[in-house]
Design a protein with these regions (language model features):
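Metal-associated gating/positioning segment near the N- to mid-region
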Residues: 78-147, 209, 237-240
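Histidine/acidic residue-rich metal-binding segments in metalloenzymes
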Residues: 174-183, 188-194, 199-266, 283, ...
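Divalent metal-dependent hydrolysis catalytic cores, especially in the metallo-beta-lactamase
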Residues: 112-138, 152-163, 187-197, 224, ...
């Protein structure tokens, strides 16, 4: 069985099992209009719309019209908002049959099953678009979802990352060739490791000049760059013209200010990835650099993650995106990052939510397609049980998921109808 056929087989099982518990069965976006009635809509750009109806045609938002006839989905009593975007996940990272972190020794068919299951969990959590950075196999899943064969979020992928080794990484031409090769294979973004893992010291792996070559070549080919960076590599990546900088642990406010001056996007993770690692330690320990020492470093330095996030929120003009770095054990829990951003960083609930909508869409160069409830955009729409502006834990209670005009989840249908007069 090929990788693609495994994905297609899984999709049939996933849809059958999950849809049986829901009120709607996923399929192609209907050509005729759908109408969502809502009394509270967060538009993804900072606005709140009251008592309206969202008209959807051919998978896109056609208009907002409070008088539109023929309500298809009555979401009054819930909070309606654009589907969330997570710009840093590892969709293929999963635990194998033995409960341990799956490695490249896992059979391809099982790897495909794990990735597709993660995609489904992520979609059910309200994330309708993700950027997965780290595996060549992401392309197969991306294409299968786009073709409608597998249910999951829209995926953008870097394929395999570019990992630095200092001067031994290669000449200028070799560095440019690394970018070109990924572009030719269909990468949507170029992932660059400018620092080693936090678990092994977080030292630099590329010079600023090397980063400028890589990010410059990507830009020349119309591709964005996402850079894994700690310490001074944060400001080096900003000066090098890279698009998005992730993590930032051990950096300081001056480094973050450099990112703001450069106009790059920045994301410090505080609410999910380290916590998930620590919770799932037994599933990771002894594989690669997941050592006792590495886990101790992550636990010890979590307050430094909070500190750089607070510095980021306090930096004028800094464009903070929403990303989780979700790996095995964290998929489907992406929304926990919202709570971390508000509690540990001082971000307002609205700012945190916008970061996963219009800010993230802009960071992907897709503001004309995603990230807001507005005419002409993709009908990626979710609903929460509760008002996240008053009770942020509502982000954990996703009751409705639509992507591209197709409903994948409407768990509250029966209860909602029974409660309506």
């Amino acid at each position: 069985m090929t990788l693609r056929s495994v994905l297609l087989a899984l999709s049939l099982g996933a849809v059958t099992v999950e849809a049986a518990a829901a009120q709607e069965v996923p399929g192609a976006a209907p050509a005729g209009p759908l109408v969502i009635q809502a009394d509270r809509v967060l538009d993804g750009r900072g606005g709140v719309i009251r008592d309206t109806r969202i008209v959807i045609e051919h998978g896109k938002i056609a208009r907002l019209d409070p008088h539109a006839a023929g309500v298809t989905y009555d979401l009054r009593g819930y909070t309606v908002l654009p589907g969330w975007i997570d710009v840093h996940v590892h969709i293929g990272s999963h635990f194998g049959r033995d409960g341990r972190l799956a490695t490249d020794k896992e059979p391809p068919a099982e790897a495909a099953l794990g990735a597709a299951a993660n995609a489904w969990r992520t979609l059910m959590a309200g994330f309708t678009t993700v950027q997965s950075v780290g595996e060549a196999a992401d392309k197969t899943l991306r294409d299968a979802i786009d073709a409608g064969g597998v249910p999951g979020p829209r995926i953008l992928t870097s394929l395999d990352p570019i990992i630095g080794r200092g001067d031994s990484t290669g000449s200028e031409e070799q560095l440019r060739a690394m970018v070109r090769e990924r572009a030719e294979r269909g990468a949507d973004v170029i992932k660059i490791f400018a620092s080693k893992s936090q678990r092994v010291g977080a030292g630099p792996t590329f010079t600023e000049a090397q980063l400028a070559i890589l990010c410059g070549e990507a830009k020349a080919r119309g591709l964005r760059t996402l850079v894994h960076a700690y310490r001074s590599s944060v400001s080096a990546a900003a000066r090098a013209g890279c698009s998005q900088i992730e993590h930032g642990t051990y950096a300081d406010s001056a480094d973050v200010a450099e990112v703001a001056r450069a106009g790059a996007y920045f994301s410090p993770q505080v609410g999910l990835v380290v916590q998930s690692y620590l919770e799932n330690k037994a599933h990771y320990l002894g594989i690669g650099n997941y050592t006792e020492e590495g886990f101790a470093i992550m636990a010890r330095d979590l307050p430094l993650d909070y500190a750089i996030c607070r510095a980021a929120v306090a930096t004028p003009g800094l464009k903070i995106v929403f990303s989780t770095d979700a790996t095995a054990g964290a998929h489907g829990r992406n929304a926990e990052e919202f709570l971390g951003r508000v509690k540990e960083c001082g971000q307002s609930p609205m700012a945190a939510l916008i970061s996963a909508n219009s800010v993230n869409a802009a960071s992907l160069g897709m503001a004309d397609r995603l990230g807001a409830i507005a005419p002409g955009l993709e009908a990626d729409i979710i609903a929460l049980d509760g008002n996240p502006l008053e009770d942020l834990t509502a982000v954990r209670r996703v009751v409705f998921v639509m992507k591209g005009g197709v409903v994948y989840k409407w768990a509250g249908a029966s209860a909602a109808r029974a409660a309506k007069p």
